[in-house]
């Protein structure tokens, strides 16, 4: 599987405050970005997989809402996370 508990723990440790920090916006955005990259690669190979395309659009929307929240709360954390993950705005 592309996303196991070890990979999640690695993402949470790198972008969150600790391995158990699953709720911070940075760790959630990092997880969404990882899943978006995986689904994008899947859709390049399977162009007619419309269910996955819908899932991808929903994930992008969730990440966008989380980024909008982070802008309102702390603009510096927002700038740091988009620079680190390479997200366009």
UniProtKB/Swiss-Prot annotation:
GO terms for biological process: translation. It holds the Pfam family Ribosomal_S15. One of its GO terms (molecular function) is rRNA binding. It comes from the Bacteria. The keyword rRNA-binding applies. The keyword RNA-binding applies. PROSITE patterns: RIBOSOMAL_S15. InterPro entries: Ribosomal_uS15, Ribosomal_uS15_bac-type, uS15_NS1_RNA-bd_sf. GO terms for cellular component: cytosolic small ribosomal subunit. SMART domains: Ribosomal_S15. Keywords: Ribonucleoprotein, Ribosomal protein, RNA-binding, rRNA-binding. Belongs to the universal ribosomal protein uS15 family. One of the primary rRNA binding proteins, it binds directly to 16S rRNA where it helps nucleate assembly of the platform of the 30S subunit by binding and bridging several RNA helices of the 16S rRNA. Part of the 30S ribosomal subunit. Forms a bridge to the 50S subunit in the 70S ribosome, contacting the 23S rRNA. NCBIfam families: S15_bact. This is Small ribosomal subunit protein uS15. It comes from Porphyromonas gingivalis (strain ATCC BAA-308 / W83). The lineage of its organism: Bacteria, Pseudomonadati, Bacteroidota, Bacteroidia, Bacteroidales.
């Amino acid at each position: 599987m592309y996303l196991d508990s070890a990979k999640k723990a690695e993402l949470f440790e790198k972008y969150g405050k600790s391995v158990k920090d699953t709720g911070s916006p940075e760790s959630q955005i990092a997880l969404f970005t990882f899943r978006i990259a995986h689904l994008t690669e899947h859709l390049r190979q399977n162009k007619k997989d419309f269910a996955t395309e819908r899932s991808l659009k929903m994930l992008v929307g969730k990440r966008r809402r989380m980024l909008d929240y982070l802008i309102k709360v702390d603009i510096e954390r927002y700038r740091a996370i988009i620079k680190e993950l390479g997200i366009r705005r």
